[in-house]
């Protein structure tokens, strides 16, 4: 067989254009395994020897270690509350009531009472126009709407008698349109059961189902007994594997390997 017939198709081995990380061998995830020596991060699958350590120096004890303010409970407190002993306290001195502050002579202004005690001439002042005067718009003579005196519309005026002709009725006249007369189908026919005897009526209800398990159960056709291979012998079966890559890392089954 010639070397040309070894390869199938147009693919031939060639040098890759760039570096492939899988082509370089490395220890892989072996370094991520826990160590088998020492005390910290020891592999639990490995046997571990005895290890001894020295204790640490304790902190100096402080002289004052009180239980805190939670234990400062008054002595008159029992498990049901206070013991009921009367307690007294001294209040502060109340302030004196302030007396009435009588106004003195300087608080009055007698010079302003001249107009009330002595005769004085009349005095007039000009004030601004009030707001109501500006809004008071009196209607003129042309603004009144007097009712007319003709006809019976005025109550206090005498009026002559009025005669009017009524319109001609279209019903029963010679020009009545008989085509607009309603036919028999226009009226609503009353049900005969209203004024006659009505026979009995019966109806059939649906079938009532007894309460029970309503889940769907598989029938005989839902099972495949020919595919059962636990109760009888079965011929061996084989399958073809797949092509594995040479760059796949091996599976670690044991740390000792």
From Swiss-Prot:
Keyword Nucleotidyltransferase: no
GO CC terms in record: cytoskeleton; motile cilium
Location within or outside the cell: Cell projection, Cilium, Flagellum
Any matching Pfam family: SHIPPO-rpt
InterPro entries: CIMAP, SHIPPO-rpt
STPGR repeat extents: 103-129, 182-207, 218-243
UniProt keyword list: Cell projection, Cilium, Flagellum, Repeat
Keyword Repeat: yes
Predominant location category: other
Domain of life: Eukaryota
Family indicated by similarity: Belongs to the CIMAP family.
Protein name (Swiss-Prot/TrEMBL): Ciliary microtubule associated protein 1B
């Amino acid at each position: 067989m010639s070397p040309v017939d070894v390869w199938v198709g147009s693919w031939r081995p060639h040098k890759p254009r760039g570096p492939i990380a899988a082509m370089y061998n490395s220890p892989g995830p072996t370094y991520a395994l826990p160590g088998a020596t020492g005390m910290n991060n020891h592999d639990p699958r490995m046997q571990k020897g005895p290890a001894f350590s020295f204790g640490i120096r304790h902190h100096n004890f402080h002289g004052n270690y009180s239980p805190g303010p939670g234990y400062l409970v008054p002595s008159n407190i029992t498990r049901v509350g206070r013991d009921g002993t009367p307690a007294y306290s001294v209040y502060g001195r109340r302030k004196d009531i302030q007396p009435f502050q009588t106004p003195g002579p300087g608080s009055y202004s007698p010079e302003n009472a001249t107009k009330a005690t002595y005769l004085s001439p009349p005095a007039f002042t000009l004030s601004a126009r009030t707001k109501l005067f500006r809004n008071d718009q009196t209607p003129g003579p042309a603004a009144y709407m007097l009712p007319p005196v003709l006809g019976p519309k005025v109550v206090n005026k005498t009026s002559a008698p009025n005669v009017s002709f009524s319109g001609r009725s279209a019903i029963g006249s010679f020009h009545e349109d008989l085509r607009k007369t309603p036919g028999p189908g226009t009226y609503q026919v009353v049900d005969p059961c209203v004024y006659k005897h009505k026979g009995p009526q019966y109806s059939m209800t649906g079938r009532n189902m007894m309460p029970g398990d309503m889940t769907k159960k598989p029938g005989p056709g839902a099972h495949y007994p020919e595919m059962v291979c636990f109760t009888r012998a079965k011929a061996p079966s084989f399958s073809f594997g797949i092509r594995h890559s040479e760059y796949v890392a091996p599976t670690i089954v044991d740390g000792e390997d």
